[in-house]
Amino acid sequence: MEKTMDKIVQVAKARGFVYPGSEIYGGLANTWDYGNLGVELKNNVKRAWWKKFIQENPYNVGVDCAILMNPQTWVASGHLGGFSDPLMDCKECHERFRADKIIEDFAQDNGIELETSVDGWTNEQMVDFIKEHNVPCPSCGKHNFTDIRQFNLMFKTFQGVTEDAKNTVYLRPETAQGIFVNFKNVQRTSRKKIPFGIGQVGKSFRNEITPGNFTFRTREFEQMELEFFCEPGTDLEWFKYWRGFCRDWLISLGIKEDEMRLRDHDPAELAFYSKGTTDIEFLFPFGWGELWGIADRTDYDLGRHQEVSGQDLTYFDDQKNEKYLPYVIEPSLGADRVVLAFLCAAYDEEDIGTPEKPDVRTVFHFHPALAPVKIGVLPLSKKLNESAEKVFAQLSKTYNCEYDDRGTIGKRYRRQDEIGTPFCVTYDFDSEEDHCVTVRDRDTMEQERIAIDELDAYFAKKFEF
């Protein structure tokens, strides 16, 4: 079975995971809406992150910061001055592209192994490569580009009734800065001592020129970020700790070790704030792509905000009787990207037929904790609806369940397989007498008979991780 993005996207759209944005108006380039199943899957992923990184973690607390911030925030963070992409236009078809992405795609398509990441190249190095290899325009195939120029990725808007410079604000390009400006507030009210972390889940916006690959790269996206504050000199130890913690979280939810890799950034490609960065990458059908960036941001952010705001952001260590600016380890995960990774990892086409009767089952093997629908409740006949609905009402108090009484039982099982439902409960005519139901396991397709009054206990630990 060849796992392709086309197959996954087709099922995702057909079953209600993801729809094209603004579809009845012809859409808006690279915007996507999460459907009835997609929103459940994404919420489950966010809950799983929050559970392990915030709720169960003794070091960390959470916040939810505003998307719009004082513009001085972005002066201090460096985003207004240095947050840009290298762009070039094709003089023939007038399409605009990111120079680094043109080079990466060309190298991949032509089997060229790049010695270093293009992220660390200068504009001159990119131009030289494009000329040396006669890289064509991805749109028209010609070889006539403009010079490379930098394009700021921040979305600009205006606050108030007049659109002038003093009312300019920006949609945040990352959630991290809201955490940094609230460092002292959170430390004071939570009474946390170093080391401790502040986590946040929220929307960010980047005016990407070449988004693509379904929901992998979009202009509006959601992040799950942790800023972990530690004593200078202990940052390498904590960097390794969180790198392993993030990797283990993915494995615990069903990502296989051979589907991901850890890639350290070359010194030339490091972000301006980073002492060291490791990306956790996932092998999508279209190739390797970053899921998680774990960065040692040192004291860059707190130092810059202290300088620009004039506020003291140092931490007083009462055990050592000294003040210092904490270093920061940042594990930053894209919610949309990791949802796509879970979709890709879980998708399967299983040959369950015989030579005489071929049969292929499409199934999403989601970890039960992530599955959009936990239990499908299926009456064998509509004559049994009244009793089956009572079972549904009982289970749906605890789990997100789906009730389906249309079609043959075999087709209903297949529908639940195709949306990744881990368990199906079938209420049949025997249930009227023995007060039991048949529970079918999605992955093994095995069935067992369980008493209705024991269902809560049966499912109690099925969805833990």
UniProtKB/Swiss-Prot annotation:
Alphabetized UniProt keyword annotations: Aminoacyl-tRNA synthetase, ATP-binding, Cytoplasm, Ligase, Nucleotide-binding, Protein biosynthesis
GO molecular function: ATP binding; catalytic activity, acting on a protein; glycine-tRNA ligase activity; protein dimerization activity; transferase activity
Chief place where the protein resides: cytoplasm
Residues reported to bind substrate: 98, 174, 221-225, 330-334
PROSITE patterns assigned: AA_TRNA_LIGASE_II
Name under which the protein is recorded: Glycine--tRNA ligase
PANTHER family reported in the protein's UniProt record: DNA POLYMERASE SUBUNIT GAMMA-2, MITOCHONDRIAL (PTHR10745:SF8), GLYCYL-TRNA SYNTHETASE/DNA POLYMERASE SUBUNIT GAMMA-2 (PTHR10745)
NCBIfam families: glyS_dimeric (TIGR00389), PRK04173.1 (NF003211)
InterPro entries membership: aa-tRNA-synt_IIb, aa-tRNA-synth_II, aa-tRNA-synth_II/BPL/LPL, Anticodon-bd, Anticodon-bd_dom_sf, Gly-tRNA_synthase/POLG2, Gly_tRNA_ligase_bac, GlyRS-like_core
Binding of ATP, residues: 206-208, 216-221, 290-291, 334-337
Pfam families: HGTP_anticodon, tRNA-synt_2b
